[in-house]
Amino acid sequence: MSKILKQLKIVGLVLLLALTLQSNSAIVYAGEKSNVGGDFTLTDHNGKKFELQQLRGKLVLIFFGYTFCPDICPTELSSLAKVLRSLGDDAEKVSALFISVDPERDTPDKLKNYVPFFSPNLIGLTGSESEISAVADAYRVQTKIHSKKKDSEYYLVDHSANLYVLGADGKMLNIIPFGLPTEHILQVVKNEINHLNKL
């Protein structure tokens, strides 16, 4: 009997270790993250010029996607919206950006009808193909268009689905991979807000 209990304890410790490693690896603290990101100028969902530097002093959350995305984008934007709602008064210290990787279809008008569905505090951004490509490269976002036929508006875009967290100085703090539970994202954001409050 004691042998069985000992084996169960070992199995339990192994599972606990696995879960710990998994939770610690969920947030990317890559040594190269200081080389990811940077300022940019795009067009917001109201058709106005938008510069990242105008958000200095705030924590900035950035997600890249597109309005025709069938699954990942709605899921992540819903999670992001829940995070913003859960922050209460601290939400005013955070700005959330949705940058389109499909500028051909995602016009400002298209974004204007899309982003408020998730949150009134979400800013939709688009631009020319060269502008979007430059920002995607700076943030190391991978994109690939699939099944696009000539003159067709129906196609899919594969893209990286990380959530980028920028500090009040515009520098990269965290790169959160797709699939992290909303509660974990919220905790990361709260931790960064607490750090911001101490500055």
Where are these regions (language model features)?
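Short active-site neighborhood of thiol/selenol oxidoreductases, capturing the structured segment around
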Residues: 53-74, 80
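Thiol-based oxidoreductase modules, predominantly thioredoxin-like and allied folds used
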Residues: 93-106, 121-130
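Conserved helix-turn-beta segment immediately C-terminal to the redox Cys motif
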Residues: 58-59, 75-99
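Thiol-/selenol-based redox modules, centered on thioredoxin-like
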Residues: 149-199
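Bacterial N-terminal signal peptides
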Residues: 11-22
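Short, internal strand/loop/helix patches
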Residues: 112-160
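Bacterial N-terminal signal peptides that target proteins for export
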Residues: 2-12
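N-terminal "domain-start" segment that seeds a small globular fold
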Residues: 26-56, 78
